Amino acid sequence: MGSQWLQGSIRHRRLYPVRHEFEYHTGMLALDTDEWNEVTNISPFFSLERFNWVSLKRKDYFRPEAGALSDAVREQVKEATGWRPDGAVELITHPRYAGYVFNPVSFYFCYRHGENGNNGDVPAVIMAQITNTPWNDRHVYCLETTGSEANSAGWRTEQFAFTKRFHVSPFNTMAQHYEWTFSFRGPELRIHMNVVEEGKKHFDATLVVHRGPLTRN
Protein backbone atom coordinates (compact mmCIF):
# COMPACT_ATOMS: atom_id res chain seq x y z
CA MET A 1 0.00 0.00 0.00
CA GLY A 2 1.34 3.41 -0.97
CA SER A 3 -0.70 5.35 1.61
CA GLN A 4 1.03 6.32 4.85
CA TRP A 5 0.43 7.86 8.26
CA LEU A 6 2.10 11.13 9.28
CA GLN A 7 2.93 11.70 12.93
CA GLY A 8 4.28 14.90 14.44
CA SER A 9 3.24 18.34 15.63
CA ILE A 10 1.61 21.54 14.45
CA ARG A 11 2.12 25.04 15.83
CA HIS A 12 -0.06 28.12 15.27
CA ARG A 13 1.12 31.63 16.16
CA ARG A 14 -0.85 34.85 15.91
CA LEU A 15 1.69 37.65 16.05
CA TYR A 16 -0.40 40.78 15.52
CA PRO A 17 -2.18 42.68 17.01
CA VAL A 18 -2.03 40.42 20.10
CA ARG A 19 0.46 37.57 20.34
CA HIS A 20 -0.96 34.12 20.99
CA GLU A 21 0.34 30.65 20.15
CA PHE A 22 -0.27 26.97 20.75
CA GLU A 23 1.26 23.67 19.66
CA TYR A 24 -0.10 20.14 19.71
CA HIS A 25 0.68 16.64 18.53
CA THR A 26 -1.09 15.55 15.37
CA GLY A 27 -1.54 12.62 13.04
CA MET A 28 -2.52 12.93 9.39
CA LEU A 29 -3.29 10.66 6.49
CA ALA A 30 -1.03 10.63 3.42
CA LEU A 31 -3.45 8.92 1.05
CA ASP A 32 -2.52 7.66 -2.39
CA THR A 33 -5.78 8.78 -4.00
CA ASP A 34 -5.73 5.77 -6.35
CA GLU A 35 -6.21 3.69 -3.17
CA TRP A 36 -9.35 5.59 -2.11
CA ASN A 37 -11.56 2.49 -2.30
CA GLU A 38 -9.09 0.16 -0.56
CA VAL A 39 -7.43 2.17 2.21
CA THR A 40 -10.19 1.61 4.78
CA ASN A 41 -9.68 -2.16 4.58
CA ILE A 42 -6.86 -1.90 7.12
CA SER A 43 -9.26 -1.68 10.08
CA PRO A 44 -12.92 -2.32 10.97
CA PHE A 45 -12.84 1.11 12.66
CA PHE A 46 -11.96 2.91 9.38
CA SER A 47 -14.80 3.31 6.85
CA LEU A 48 -15.58 4.89 3.51
CA GLU A 49 -18.72 7.01 3.08
CA ARG A 50 -20.27 5.99 6.39
CA PHE A 51 -19.92 6.80 10.08
CA ASN A 52 -17.08 5.18 12.03
CA TRP A 53 -14.38 6.17 14.48
CA VAL A 54 -12.30 7.13 11.43
CA SER A 55 -13.80 7.69 7.98
CA LEU A 56 -13.38 9.31 4.58
CA LYS A 57 -16.12 11.01 2.60
CA ARG A 58 -15.71 12.14 -0.98
CA LYS A 59 -17.74 15.31 -0.33
CA ASP A 60 -14.98 16.61 1.96
CA TYR A 61 -12.54 16.97 -0.92
CA PHE A 62 -12.02 18.58 -4.30
CA ARG A 63 -14.95 18.59 -6.73
CA PRO A 64 -16.99 15.70 -5.25
CA GLU A 65 -19.36 15.84 -8.23
CA ALA A 66 -16.49 14.96 -10.61
CA GLY A 67 -16.16 11.30 -9.65
CA ALA A 68 -12.81 9.80 -8.68
CA LEU A 69 -10.74 12.23 -6.60
CA SER A 70 -7.47 11.28 -8.31
CA ASP A 71 -8.89 12.08 -11.76
CA ALA A 72 -10.45 15.36 -10.58
CA VAL A 73 -7.13 16.56 -9.17
CA ARG A 74 -5.18 15.52 -12.27
CA GLU A 75 -7.59 17.43 -14.51
CA GLN A 76 -7.42 20.55 -12.32
CA VAL A 77 -3.62 20.51 -12.32
CA LYS A 78 -3.60 20.09 -16.10
CA GLU A 79 -5.96 23.05 -16.47
CA ALA A 80 -3.82 25.22 -14.17
CA THR A 81 -0.33 24.23 -15.34
CA GLY A 82 -0.65 22.42 -18.67
CA TRP A 83 0.79 19.20 -17.16
CA ARG A 84 -1.37 16.24 -16.20
CA PRO A 85 0.22 14.34 -13.30
CA ASP A 86 1.48 10.97 -14.53
CA GLY A 87 2.51 9.67 -11.10
CA ALA A 88 0.86 9.30 -7.71
CA VAL A 89 -1.50 11.96 -6.36
CA GLU A 90 -1.10 11.97 -2.58
CA LEU A 91 -3.65 13.67 -0.31
CA ILE A 92 -2.31 15.10 2.97
CA THR A 93 -5.33 15.53 5.24
CA HIS A 94 -7.15 14.76 8.45
CA PRO A 95 -9.81 12.09 7.96
CA ARG A 96 -13.10 12.32 9.81
CA TYR A 97 -12.99 11.34 13.48
CA ALA A 98 -16.32 10.15 14.89
CA GLY A 99 -18.00 11.86 11.94
CA TYR A 100 -16.33 15.25 12.48
CA VAL A 101 -13.89 16.81 10.02
CA PHE A 102 -11.78 19.97 10.26
CA ASN A 103 -9.34 20.68 7.44
CA PRO A 104 -8.53 24.37 6.95
CA VAL A 105 -6.08 23.17 4.31
CA SER A 106 -5.50 19.83 2.60
CA PHE A 107 -2.61 19.28 0.20
CA TYR A 108 -2.49 17.19 -2.95
CA PHE A 109 1.10 16.22 -3.78
CA CYS A 110 1.27 15.44 -7.51
CA TYR A 111 4.30 13.37 -8.47
CA ARG A 112 6.05 12.54 -11.71
CA HIS A 113 5.88 8.98 -13.02
CA GLY A 114 7.84 6.60 -10.78
CA GLU A 115 8.12 9.05 -7.89
CA ASN A 116 6.17 9.18 -4.62
CA GLY A 117 6.28 10.47 -1.09
CA ASN A 118 7.47 7.15 0.31
CA ASN A 119 10.88 7.83 -1.23
CA GLY A 120 11.06 11.45 -0.11
CA ASP A 121 10.56 12.69 -3.66
CA VAL A 122 9.46 16.30 -4.14
CA PRO A 123 6.10 16.58 -5.93
CA ALA A 124 6.08 18.36 -9.29
CA VAL A 125 2.94 20.28 -8.29
CA ILE A 126 1.40 20.96 -4.89
CA MET A 127 -2.31 21.70 -5.00
CA ALA A 128 -3.65 23.27 -1.81
CA GLN A 129 -7.36 23.07 -1.04
CA ILE A 130 -8.39 25.83 1.38
CA THR A 131 -11.67 25.48 3.28
CA ASN A 132 -12.87 28.54 5.18
CA THR A 133 -14.65 28.62 8.52
CA PRO A 134 -17.55 28.86 9.18
CA TRP A 135 -18.79 29.16 5.59
CA ASN A 136 -17.30 25.88 4.34
CA ASP A 137 -16.39 27.35 0.93
CA ARG A 138 -13.33 26.08 -0.94
CA HIS A 139 -10.57 27.40 -3.14
CA VAL A 140 -7.48 25.76 -4.63
CA TYR A 141 -3.99 27.03 -5.39
CA CYS A 142 -1.73 25.06 -7.77
CA LEU A 143 1.97 25.57 -7.00
CA GLU A 144 4.67 24.30 -9.38
CA THR A 145 7.94 23.22 -7.75
CA THR A 146 11.41 23.97 -9.13
CA GLY A 147 13.25 20.70 -8.50
CA SER A 148 15.54 22.21 -5.87
CA GLU A 149 18.77 20.50 -4.84
CA ALA A 150 19.27 19.19 -1.31
CA ASN A 151 21.16 21.44 1.10
CA SER A 152 24.02 20.28 3.33
CA ALA A 153 21.54 18.88 5.86
CA GLY A 154 19.73 16.87 3.19
CA TRP A 155 16.61 19.05 2.99
CA ARG A 156 15.05 19.90 -0.37
CA THR A 157 13.04 23.10 0.01
CA GLU A 158 10.40 24.71 -2.19
CA GLN A 159 9.20 28.26 -1.47
CA PHE A 160 6.16 30.13 -2.76
CA ALA A 161 4.85 33.67 -2.30
CA PHE A 162 1.46 34.62 -3.68
CA THR A 163 -1.52 36.91 -3.18
CA LYS A 164 -4.45 35.79 -1.10
CA ARG A 165 -7.44 35.20 -3.40
CA PHE A 166 -9.96 33.68 -1.00
CA HIS A 167 -11.50 34.86 2.28
CA VAL A 168 -10.56 32.37 4.99
CA SER A 169 -11.20 33.86 8.41
CA PRO A 170 -12.99 36.90 9.87
CA PHE A 171 -9.68 37.67 11.62
CA ASN A 172 -7.67 37.96 8.38
CA THR A 173 -8.22 40.55 5.64
CA MET A 174 -7.99 40.13 1.87
CA ALA A 175 -5.03 42.56 1.81
CA GLN A 176 -2.73 39.79 3.00
CA HIS A 177 -0.43 37.50 1.05
CA TYR A 178 1.03 34.08 1.72
CA GLU A 179 4.60 32.82 2.04
CA TRP A 180 4.75 29.03 2.11
CA THR A 181 7.77 26.76 2.51
CA PHE A 182 7.74 22.99 1.96
CA SER A 183 10.78 20.96 3.05
CA PHE A 184 11.41 17.30 2.23
CA ARG A 185 14.05 14.91 3.59
CA GLY A 186 13.42 11.19 3.24
CA PRO A 187 10.39 10.37 5.42
CA GLU A 188 10.40 13.85 7.00
CA LEU A 189 8.08 16.64 5.87
CA ARG A 190 7.88 20.24 7.08
CA ILE A 191 5.37 22.85 5.96
CA HIS A 192 5.63 26.46 7.13
CA MET A 193 3.03 29.08 6.22
CA ASN A 194 3.32 32.86 6.82
CA VAL A 195 0.43 35.32 6.50
CA VAL A 196 1.81 38.80 5.76
CA GLU A 197 0.15 42.22 5.48
CA GLU A 198 1.93 45.50 4.67
CA GLY A 199 5.32 43.89 5.27
CA LYS A 200 4.37 42.59 8.72
CA LYS A 201 3.84 38.93 9.56
CA HIS A 202 0.46 38.55 11.28
CA PHE A 203 0.26 34.77 11.58
CA ASP A 204 2.23 31.61 10.90
CA ALA A 205 1.69 27.87 11.12
CA THR A 206 4.26 25.08 11.08
CA LEU A 207 3.64 21.38 10.49
CA VAL A 208 6.48 18.93 11.26
CA VAL A 209 5.72 15.26 10.58
CA HIS A 210 7.43 11.95 9.93
CA ARG A 211 6.09 9.31 7.56
CA GLY A 212 5.32 5.81 8.75
CA PRO A 213 3.32 2.79 7.63
CA LEU A 214 -0.46 2.97 7.64
CA THR A 215 -1.53 0.03 9.79
CA ARG A 216 -4.35 -0.82 12.17
CA ASN A 217 -1.95 -0.03 15.04
Residue ranges of predicted features:
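Mature, function-bearing regions of proteins
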Residues: M1-N217
